[in-house]
C-alpha cells in the first residue's frame, strides 16, 4: 500500500543490497493481491542497485534523509510485538532488534515463527532479505528507518535532516516536523525500569501507525 505514496515507484530506502526469495508459482498470486502494492524492495527479479554511502529513507514525498551511522551506545536488544494498521486493517509481527556500537540487525517473524525479513546495517552498508511482505505493515526498510528514528539520539539525527526539519523530544513524545512546521512522525515513549522505550509510531504523511 505504501508504494503508491512514495516517490521513485515506492522505494523507501536506497543504498540497499537485497535478496528477495519468491517462487515463480507464487508471483501471480502476489500480483493479484495487496502484496504487489507493497513489494517495495524492487521485486523478486530486479534488485535495487547499491549506491555509495549510507542508505537513505523517505520522510515524505520529495524529502529524503541519510540514515545515521549504525552504531549506538549503550547497546540495544529487544524483542517486541509490532501491530500495524492501515485503512482499518491490522497485522502483527514479532520484531527482534539487536544493535551495538558497530552493527544493527532487525528480524521480523510471523505469529507462527516464519521469518519475514532480516535487515543488517553496518559499516559496509545495508543488506536486507525479505521473503514475505505483510500488507498491513510498512516494508522492512521503512521499519528500520522508524526503529532508528525512535531509538537513536537526536544528536545523531539532527545533522542528517533536511534543511529546516526538526526532531524534538517533548515529554513522553518525539516529534519530527518538516520545514513548514507540519508534524510528520510522532513517537510515543514509556518509562520501563528506568529506560525510555518507544511504544508507538504514527506516520502522518504515509498514513500508518505502529504499536509496539
Region roles according to the model:
Residues 71-123, 128:
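N-terminal mature ectodomain segment of secretory-pathway/periplasmic proteins
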Residues 165-212:
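Gly/Pro-enriched, hydrophobic low-complexity segments
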Residues 53-78:
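Post-signal peptide N-terminal segment of mature Sec-exported envelope proteins
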Residues 45-48:
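Bacterial signal peptide processing site
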